[in-house]
């Protein structure tokens, strides 16, 4: 079955932002307090983006890949807010959770990014990692409670790559640390090329579960995606609904059906050249619509009937 490709092939850097379709505008247009219709860019939802804590020889830095910031601005139409990997900086875990809850309540969406680091295995009762495995305990200590509280408080959540793995662990699932060493699994790692477009090139198909959220959003049963991960889902979390698998059976997407708001996790990277790819834009459009809906409610603005 011929599928769509979930990453663009163009190399142009300057891109215009596509206008919303009439259907999207009918469904998600906000109405200003004055009663005048607002266009899609008139209200930018606040979207928090997860950060990594990295040492670069000159100290420790909270970092976010530029592609995630650009996707939040241009594909979501959001004002991005970087969420530092605060870890245990507030002392006791309860203080960290209280701080995160204050942050969550001010956000209209959360975007969980990818990262070369692995979730520490003690969070899912896994075996010790091999020597040299990259970890980010401060990020784990931030994102795992952030995920649970964002979902339970009705904040739209879109998770990418490591973000998917974090959501699975946060909700009680487990991970393969090295998917390519699991019997029957392909190597899901990317090439080691200095050319980013080579690393993010189409790698394999994913089969989409009929009738699920992803199927409803894309209208496709198969798409082709990039692949840049060694870690992956082993046991799917009890609250998660499988949305897509690779041809080797590896989990590629899941949703959280009991979440009050949009909650979707992808193993691939739709943020890479998102504006050039219709599949990626359908996903970001759905996340954006959910974020605008929360922004309207949070600011006390009326919202037209949501799309079915």
Question: What is the predicted function of each stretch?
Answer:
Residues 264-267:
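Active-site-proximal beta-strand elements of phosphoester/diester hydrolases
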């Amino acid at each position: 079955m011929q599928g769509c490709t979930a990453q663009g092939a163009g190399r142009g850097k300057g891109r215009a932002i596509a206008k919303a379709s009439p259907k999207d505008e009918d469904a998600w247009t906000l109405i200003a307090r004055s009663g005048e219709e607002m266009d899609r860019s008139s209200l930018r939802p606040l979207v928090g983006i997860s950060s990594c804590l990295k040492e670069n020889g000159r100290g420790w830095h909270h970092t976010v890949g530029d592609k995630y910031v650009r996707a939040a601005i241009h594909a979501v139409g959001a004002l991005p807010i970087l969420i530092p990997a605060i870890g245990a900086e507030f002392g006791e875990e309860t203080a960290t959770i209280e701080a995160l809850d204050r942050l969550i309540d001010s956000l209209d969406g959360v975007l969980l990014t990818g990262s070369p680091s692995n979730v520490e295995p003690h969070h899912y009762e896994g075996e010790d990692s091999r020597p040299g495995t990259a970890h980010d305990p401060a990020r784990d200590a931030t994102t795992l409670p952030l995920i649970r509280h964002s979902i339970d408080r009705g904040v739209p959540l879109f998770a990418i790559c490591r973000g998917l793995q974090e959501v699975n662990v946060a909700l009680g699932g487990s991970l393969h640390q090295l998917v390519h060493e699991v019997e029957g699994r392909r190597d899901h790692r990317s090439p080691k090329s200095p050319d980013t477009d080579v690393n993010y090139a189409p790698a394999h198909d994913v089969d989409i579960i009929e009738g699920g959220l992803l199927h409803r959003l894309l209208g496709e049963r198969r798409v082709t995606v990039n692949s840049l991960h060694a870690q992956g889902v082993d046991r799917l979390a009890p609250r998660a609904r499988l949305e897509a698998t690779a041809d080797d059976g590896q989990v590629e997407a899941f949703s959280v059906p009991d979440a009050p708001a949009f909650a979707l996790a992808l193993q691939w990277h739709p943020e890479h050249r998102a504006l050039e790819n219709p599949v990626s834009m359908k996903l970001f459009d759905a996340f954006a619509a959910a974020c605008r809906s929360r922004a309207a409610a949070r600011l006390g603005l009326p919202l037209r009937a949501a799309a079915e």
